[in-house]
Design a protein with these regions (language model features):
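Charge-rich, low-complexity segments
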Residues: 1-67, 74-81, 100-101, 129-152
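Acidic, proline/glycine-rich low-complexity IDRs
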Residues: 1-8, 98-179
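Residues in well-ordered beta-strands of folded domains
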Residues: 41, 95, 117
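Aromatic-enriched hydrophobic runs in primary sequence
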Residues: 51-54, 68, 94, 164, ...
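Residue-level signal for functionally critical sites in structured catalytic/ligand-binding pockets
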Residues: 57, 61, 69, 80, ...
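Amphipathic protein-protein interaction modules
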Residues: 63-113
Length: 179
């Protein structure tokens, strides 16, 4: 449910154990009337050490979002605010005011392996954690562009050394003939 005019940020990170994690975080002001958080976990097969999804897994996620999640969120008045991809699962974060069981009913037929979590979160604390992660990433990017150490001083050029080895042949003036 990434519509026109929405601003999304991608943050790539690593967990403490070195496992790569990717976040997509939507930029929006919390809507306090949407006081429940709902998270969908969609597992995917992992085949390499990164434990990140392959192309088929991304296509499955896209199909789920377009054909199942977006219509359910629109019908029930929920807002998708972020996602996390790590260690064999996609996690989709959303806020709403409707009964979360209605979302479970609409989404569970897509795949029996889907997992669901919901909680009362009127202060949008989970979203605040995602935004804090985004701000940390922004600060790190700025840090990379403006290093903390002073630039190295330019050294004076070393004096030219005399060449050793075979000397270069001298240029000769062309000979002219006398008439």
């Amino acid at each position: 449910m990434r519509g026109d005019g929405e601003v999304w940020h991608i943050v790539e990170a690593k967990r403490d154990d070195g496992t790569p994690t990717t976040f997509q975080i939507r930029e929006l002001d919390p809507k306090k009337h949407l006081d429940r958080i709902f998270v969908v976990e969609m597992p995917y097969p992992t085949t390499d050490s990164s434990r990140l999804p392959d192309a088929a897994s991304y296509r499955k996620l896209q199909r789920f979002e377009e054909q199942w999640l977006d219509p359910a969120l629109t019908t029930l008045g929920w807002e998708l605010v972020g996602s996390k991809t790590e260690d064999g699962s996609f996690f989709l974060y959303m806020y709403g005011a409707a009964d979360p069981e209605q979302l479970v009913e609409k989404l569970s037929p897509f795949d029996a392996a889907l997992g669901f979590f919901n909680d009362h979160d009127p202060e949008w604390a989970e979203y605040a954690t995602l935004r804090e992660l985004l701000e940390q990433a922004r600060a790190m990017k700025q840090y990379d562009e403006k290093p903390w150490r002073a630039p190295a001083k330019k050294r004076k050029a070393a004096p030219k050394k005399k060449a050793t080895g075979t000397p270069r042949p001298k240029k000769r003036k062309p000979r002219t003939r006398a008439k």
